[in-house]
Swiss-Prot record:
Residues that make up the propeptide removed upon maturation: 20-236
UniProt-recorded name of the protein: Inhibin beta E chain
Similarity comment text for this entry: Belongs to the TGF-beta family.
Subunit details: Homodimeric or heterodimeric through association with alpha and beta subunits, linked by one or more disulfide bonds. Inhibins are heterodimers of one alpha and one beta subunit. Activins are homo- or heterodimers of beta subunits only.
Glycosylation site residues: 198
Disulfide linkage: 240-248, 247-315, 276-347, 280-349
InterPro entries in the record: Cystine-knot_cytokine (IPR029034), Inhibin_betaC (IPR001318), TGF-b_C (IPR001839), TGF-beta-rel (IPR015615), TGFb_CS (IPR017948)
Recorded GO MF terms: cytokine activity; growth factor activity; hormone activity
Gene (UniProt): INHBE
Protein localization: Secreted
Organism field: Homo sapiens
């Protein structure tokens, strides 16, 4: 968590404490509530910061060239909602930009990848759409182009396939052949020709792959953190009831449409931004809590500045679960990831 963010929420929580009156000794211990509109505005701002921090972004992506709808629909079918691969894994859909298609038989595809350095690639598949001009059997060879090279000998053969049907095809690529680009730019050359001896090939060469139309090629990548983190057991706690003054979980649903973020967050439509609130009598002090969380980190900072007596106990999260997101990054790639510790499931007294 960055220092400016801590200072921002420090100010907000101080405002909350002042609104609750001098009798309250902890910002989550109950007392007078904020007005509903003010509370909702605070929740929405917290949701924005929580999502950006969880995705390691400084600002929301600006989508200037969204992927074609047909290709995006196909890609989203590959990325179903739910948990991604174990070990803090991610799934990424990267759409191709055609940088050279002067020949009917050859195309150069450019992909702008945004794989974190702390992750490694372990699975890669290329999706291509074969046009109805398919002459019979097609021989497709996929090469990787090295950086700053233009000679024919600079390319490396990754895969070779024979195709006999039109429509979408998925081609597995060796993940080892796609690693090592520090710039994040990957270039693949497709050499697509009718199989030699095919009697149906007549006349001028015709384009066989849809590389620039609505069926845009894309890469399906799976990446995993180098040092997977351990999972946490899930625990639940009752939600706050109107007549319950003790520490409990207060539930808020945040719709991404309300945030104005539906253009880059594809799934889900929203999530539960829960937080902990209520009184912590002395006999509840020291209940299990999570020290290294966004919620309790701010409270710990406040307590370190000694605004309350040393014996004060605060209502903080004791269990969290991840949030699975499908979103478009700054390069227009579709990313599927589980953001850890996003949804509060249980609360307790620190």
């Amino acid at each position: 968590m960055r220092l400016p963010d801590v200072q921002l929420w420090l100010v907000l929580l101080w405002a909350l404490v002042r609104a609750q009156g001098t009798g309250s000794v902890c910002p989550s211990c109950g007392g007078s509530k904020l007005a509903p509109q003010a509370e909702r505005a605070l929740v929405l701002e917290l949701a924005k910061q929580q999502i950006l921090d969880g995705l390691h972004l400084t600002s929301r992506p600006r989508i200037t060239h969204p992927p074609p709808q047909a290709a995006l629909t196909r890609a989203l079918r590959r990325l179903q909602p739910g948990s991604v691969a174990p070990g803090n894994g991610e799934e990424v859909i990267s759409f191709a930009t055609v940088t050279d298609s002067t020949s009917a038989y050859s195309s150069l595809l450019t992909f702008h990848l945004s794989t974190p350095r702390s992750h490694h690639l372990y699975h890669a598949r290329l999706w291509l759409h074969v046009l109805p001009t398919l002459p019979g059997t097609l021989c497709l060879r996929i090469f990787r182009w090295g950086p700053r090279r233009r000679r024919q000998g600079s390319r490396t053969l990754l895969a070779e396939h024979h195709i006999t049907n039109l429509g979408w095809h998925t081609l597995t690529l060796p993940s080892s052949g796609l690693r090592g680009e520090k710039s994040g730019v990957l270039k693949l050359q497709l050499d697509c020709r009718p199989l030699e001896g095919n009697s149906t090939v007549t006349g001028q060469p015709r384009r066989l792959l849809d590389t620039a139309g609505h069926q845009q090629p894309f890469l399906e990548l799976k990446i995993r953190a180098n040092e997977p983190g351990a999972g946490r057991a899930r625990r639940r706690t009752p939600t706050c009831e109107p007549a319950t003054p003790l520490c409990c979980r207060r539930d808020h649903y945040v719709d991404f449409q309300e945030l104005g973020w539906r253009d880059w967050i594809l799934q889900p439509e929203g999530y539960q931004l829960n937080y902990c609130s209520g009184q912590c009598p002395p006999h509840l002090a020291g209940s299990p809590g999570i020290a290294a969380s966004f919620h309790s980190a701010v409270f710990s900072l406040l307590k370190a500045n000694n605004p309350w007596p040393a014996s004060t106990s605060c209502c903080v999260p004791t269990a969290r679960r991840p949030l699975s997101l499908l979103y478009l990054d700054h390069n227009g790639n579709v990313v599927k990831t589980d953001v850890p510790d996003m949804v509060v499931e249980a609360c307790g007294c620190s």
